A protein has these predicted regions:
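A short, basic N-terminal segment
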Residues: 1-99, 254, 263-271
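Pre-Walker A (pre-P-loop) alpha-helix and adjacent loop at the N terminus of AAA/AAA+ ATPase modules
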Residues: 87-119
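Short glycine-rich substrate-engagement loop in P-loop NTPases that contacts/grips substrate
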Residues: 97-101, 137, 141-179, 198
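Walker A/P-loop nucleotide-binding motif
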Residues: 112-133
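Loop/turn-to-beta-strand initiation segments
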Residues: 145-146, 179-182, 214-220
Length: 271
């Protein structure tokens, strides 16, 4: 007995493809996402002479932007991605931040070390320090710098066993934060009200020392003073030690942001 089989014509261009064949359409999707196409045997675009990937049409530039965006999302700071230095008010020192960013970009162009490696941004609560540094990071990621954002307490939590996100190992967490061209370490000592544990001191000093040795820039924000005073909250040196304070003050620029608490309601809540 024979069985009749229906046959259908195949439209040209829609023929079945060999298993695991990567089509041009798939490559374009991966390219837009900033994937490393060299893993698929696709030749990489030539490295720019100045070492900077700035054009968003270039996959590497989109990859740099994705690194920054993902770090902001991990910090639940999606809303801060809209800020640029031109949006800041004079109290947030946009011109100083822009000049420092220019120096970082110029250093990478000439494959050298920035003259000022650390930017320390202290100030009272709610003055817009995080907003200012987010604007700095937004523009840095668009100017060819590998830029990451992380809160100090979050970094320490990620360095603990089984504490890292996305199935990363602890050494991978350290690697990604040590190797960034610009690291924004937000709320330094933000959840510490006394002498830090040996773990916190060791991990923080290791991060800062490694970045200094590699010539990579770090911006710190904090609500604390460098040192505490009688009857006042402890300062950075009181919590992490004089050795750490000397590390971040070396080759540093101070940008103090003071002013009213921007998050405080204009009318006090009665409750």
């Amino acid at each position: 007995m024979s069985v009749a089989m229906d046959t259908y014509p195949i439209t040209p261009g829609s023929e079945p493809r060999p298993l695991f064949q990567v089509t041009d359409a798939v490559i374009e999707v991966l390219r837009r996402g900033g994937a490393d196409l060299s893993q698929l045997g696709v030749p990489a675009q030539p490295e720019p002479e100045d070492g900077l990937w700035e054009k968003v049409s270039v996959p590497q530039a989109r990859a740099l932007k994705n690194i920054w965006t993902n770090s902001m999302k991990e910090a639940a700071h999606d809303d801060y991605l809209r800020w640029r230095l031109d949006d800041l008010d004079p109290l947030q020192k946009p011109n100083t931040l822009r000049n420092w960013l220019d120096s970082l970009v110029q250093a990478k162009e000439r494959k050298g070390r920035p003259e000022t490696l650390n930017l320390i941004v202290p100030g009272n609560v709610g003055t817009g320090k995080t907003t200012a540094l987010a604007a700095l990071g937004n523009e840095a990621s668009e100017r060819g710098l590998v830029t990451r954002f992380v809160k100090h307490a979050t970094y320490l939590a990620w360095r603990r066993p089984d504490g890292s996100p996305d199935d990363l190992r602890a050494y991978q967490v350290r690697k990604r934060h040590v190797e960034a061209d610009l690291l924004i370490l937000d709320e330094l000592c933000g959840e510490m009200d006394g002498i830090a544990t040996e773990f916190a001191r060791r991990e923080t000093i290791d991060l800062v020392d490694s970045r200094l040795a590699a010539g990579r820039a770090t911006a710190f924000s904090t609500n604390l003073k460098s040192r505490g005073a009688p009857g006042k909250p402890p300062g950075i040196a009181d919590i992490l030690g004089d050795r750490f304070l000397s590390r971040i003050e070396a080759r540093a620029h101070l940008v103090t942001i003071q002013g009213p608490d921007r998050r405080k309601p204009h009318k006090p809540l009665d409750w």
